[in-house]
Each structure stands twice: as C-alpha cells, then as structure tokens.
Regions:
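Conserved alpha-helix/loop element of class I SAM-dependent methyltransferases that forms part
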Residues: 1-21, 31-35
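Class I SAM-dependent methyltransferase SAM/SAH-binding core
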Residues: 22-70
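Short conserved loop adjoining the S-adenosyl-L-methionine
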Residues: 70-75, 91
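A conserved beta-strand element that flanks and buttresses the S-adenosyl-L-methionine
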Residues: 82
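A short glycine-rich, Lys/Arg-flanked "PGG" loop and its adjoining helix->strand segment in the class I
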Residues: 94-110
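Short alpha-helix
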Residues: 151-181
Length: 261
C-alpha cells in the first residue's frame, strides 16, 4: 500500500476525511485518480495546468484547468482539498498552500518533499536532485516542470515549522492543528538513470545507511504528509469571542499594561 493511500485510509477511519464529500485535488494527475478511487472517494474534481487535457482523462472524476496559486474557488465549495507532490512545481509553493487553506471548507491534506539534515547531505552528494529534470524529459521536453512548462522546477522541500509559521501568519486569530505523517521514498528510479555502473552501484550501496538513519529518526525521512484540520481550529485565548479583535479583558488582566488605558 502506498504512503498516499495509507494516509488517506487512516484519516477516513478516524472520520477526518469523508470519501463522499466534495473534494478538490490541486496539481493532480493519474496517480491521484487511481489512489482516490481505491480509497473510495466519489465526488472529486482533479485540477492542474495541463493544456493537453480534454476533460475526460480522470473519469468518473471531473477535471478543471486551475492554477493552484490562484484558486478560482468559492471558499467552502470543496470540503477537503488534497495535493500530492505538486506544490514544488509552483512558482510560489507557499501561496498555493495558503490558497488551499483559504478555500477548503474542512481540511487540507498535502504530501511533499521534506527538508532535513540528511536530505541536505544527500543533495550535496548528488543523491537527490536540486532541479527536476526527469519530469520535463519524461514529458517530451515540453511539460512537467515549473508551472507545467519545459523549464525544470526546483525541488522545494518543507519543514513542519515552516508550515506552522505560514498558517500562523495567514490565520493569526486561530490555533490551527496540523498533523504529520512520514515516509521514506528511496530514489531507485533516479539511480537507474546513472550511466556509470560503478557510480550506480555506489549510490545503491549508500541507500542502506540512509534508510537506517531515517527509520531511527523519522524526521530525517524525505517525504511527509501534513493534514490541516480547519474544523478543529480554536480561537486564540486573547481574541474577542466573535473573533473580531484583541480582547481588552485579556490584555488588561494585570500581566500586561494596557497602552490604551
């Protein structure tokens, strides 16, 4: 079972995701269709910036030509918004994530590359790419890169703290719960492309120690999912009950001197 499918099933079993609820997939493709079908999702719109689409590629699901960095979606139209390994193709992955958060009615689920000390070392050694050449080459050198163009995109890698700081900046009035899932994805396909057999063998041999470190320290894994539960948001204790402003009663409790007094 893939990490994607396993995470979906976990959240469905816990009642955090509803397979029957309207669901938007951002920067989606065939893998999303296959995985969501297997997980039992029924009301899905898969969106991307692929001008080659005619509209029925993801049937029985709908398709829409949508820019993930500027979602033309009424907030709440989709109960849940899902993205799998597509934000790093955006010009601004942060903007795309915040667009998903703005528009989702209940929750956002994202799967992306994770930054870590181990990943930075692997990048320096050339085990993992800084730019994604394979995706463009695999699409006839015309698509698959930055904003689905022929320009290879940088592989943006996230941290938990980065996600939390973004949400705190965008929605400061609320405490927003975020849950994380971790996975190790070994670069077998990339290693297979190495022309020199000795270098290829050396790369394969290096996977064992990296795998051991990642298993012992899960936050050194190179892929993670994060689930943003908008329904479980809590108003900050220093906000007015209606969420409109800072509470005067909180600020004037004696711990702080009210500058407006």
């Amino acid at each position: 079972m893939s990490f994607y499918l396993e995470t979906l099933k976990t959240l469905i079993a816990e009642g955090k995701l509803d397979p029957a609820a309207p669901t938007l997939v951002v920067a989606g493709g065939g893998k999303d269709r296959a995985t969501l079908m297997e997980a039992g999702f029924t009301d899905v719109t898969i969106s991307n910036l692929d001008e080659r689409m005619v509209g029925d590629e993801f049937a029985p699901y709908a398709w829409s030509f949508i820019d993930g960095e500027n979602l033309p979606v009424e907030p709440g139209r989709f109960a849940q918004i899902i993205e799998h390994m597509g934000l790093h193709h955006c010009g601004s992955p942060h903007r795309a994530l915040l667009e998903m958060y703005r528009c989702a009615g209940r929750s956002v689920l994202v799967f992306e590359n994770r930054d870590s000390l181990a990943m930075r070392l692997a990048t320096r050694l050339g085990f993992v790419p800084v730019y994604e050449f394979e995706a463009v080459a695999g699409n006839g050198y015309r698509y698959g890169g930055y904003r689905n163009t022929a320009i290879p995109n940088a592989v943006y890698r996230w941290t938990e703290r980065e996600v939390e700081k973004m949400l705190a900046s965008w929605d400061p009035a609320h405490q927003v719960p975020v849950r994380y899932f971790y996975n190790l994805r070994l670069p077998h396909a990339r290693i297979a492309l190495i022309g020199n057999p000795l270098v290829r063998a050396a790369f394969r041999a290096s996977l064992l120690p990296f795998s051991l470190v990642a298993r012992i320290f899960p936050k050194q894994m190179n892929e993670f999912g994060f689930f943003i539960d908008k329904q479980a948001r809590a108003l900050q204790p220093w906000m007015e009950p209606d969420g409109s402003a800072l509470s005067r009663s909180y600020w004037g409790t004696g711990k702080w001197k009210d500058p407006a007094a």
